[in-house]
Amino acid sequence: MRNLKQTAIALATLLNTTACGITPTATLMTLPTSAGDHSYTLQAAAAGQGKTSGANRWMTQPAQGVRTQFRTFYSQAARSEVSYHLYVPAAYEQQRRQRFPVLYWLHGTGAGTSAIPFLTEQIDQAIRAGKLPPMLVVFPNGQDISMWSNSKDGKTPMETVVVKELVPHLDRTFRTQAQREGRLLEGMSMGGYGAARLGFEHSQTFGAISMLGAGPLDLAFQGPKAEANPALREGVLSVTFGNDMAYYQKLSPWRTAERQARHLRGRLKLRMLIGERDFTLADNEAFRQHLSKLGLRHEYRTVPGVGHKLEGLVTALGDEYWTFFRNALNAR
């Protein structure tokens, strides 16, 4: 294995690119702050948008998005202020006695906040057109390579921060539908991995899971991306999993699905979307077959002409993209 300095330099190079090919744009709104939560008004899109703020990995730079706020809360687990972004639909202000479902959207490796401008614009348009029920959308800060998991060394308790602290914080601070049926999970790439892992492990908290180009899903962590970028694989294994393949496998969606299968059968709402040109296609196909063998029903769709790109998946499916969320919420 290369030395840590070389790995760090290679990781910095890999992660210093624009994720998903999305250019940040859009507008902003603000809401009054609540106790324990801090809201900030955003100005022009900041250079370095989506990167962590200084030495504090738990804080990102503010990103702009349609009807989007940059907010923070104090995490006991992280012993730090932690940032997140929040999309708030117009109906939240107009219907003050109503409670709203919440979509937790998990970003990919090194992607930070780069998807927020595109996604909030698409979500806002879908809600205004009646294609998607009004909902809050939370964009947690998953750092660069957390895998949305608690790191083995305890320094990055990401799963605890998101599930045990951020979710209750949102329920205290906003008029949410504070039960599993009112909470949705979606993520791209590392975020798809995280959506599956957290959704399977905490099925009492989340009612529906949407995986987009999810990975890594193989138990050996030897997929095409890992082979093409060995420094990234080494960094993830070292920083998050303590170079312990047994720990990596224990936390994997593959093993988590096996452990939780009896709790998930009959109540799991799961969608898998994958571009036909996505390098994770083979691993997603294998994972789909694994879920079927476990008796876990799910939607699975490959999208022609699309690679490992969020924007490509959403654009290619058009209005159909929102059907999964509508059905998940209407089935309650």
Predicted regions located by residue number:
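Bacterial N-terminal signal peptides that target proteins for export
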Residues: 1-8
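Bacterial N-terminal signal peptides
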Residues: 10-18
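Non-catalytic cap/lid and distal C-terminal segments of serine-dependent acyl enzymes
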Residues: 21-332
